[in-house]
């Protein structure tokens, strides 16, 4: 029988393996952003001291209740901020799964625009789905671009 310490070590190893597998699939483009968010438990947390220079583009991290995808490999210790404030380095992932909807984050230029069928969790606690591609508006700003998920 395993000790508690051994069990925890096995769980850490499994978590690291799952994170590496998801990172590989994301970098290869063999999973969608929806699938990445569906497997968010395997997404590593953003570390502001980590060197992401050797990480492949599209590798996911979680931060501030969002999943971010690496756009530009870099050493985070050389930058002040988080993915939400370093949008030239990190892109926002979106989901088409209403059960995993994330809070709305304003797009940054063309990065992070909401495409048709992508979902958000709005400030009223309700889930909305975009009915238009290249959607940069909130449900409050341009309601016709969003449909309430019942």
Residues of each region from the PLM?
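Tryptophan-rich substrate-binding surfaces of secreted polymer-degrading and adhesive proteins
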Residues: 2-150
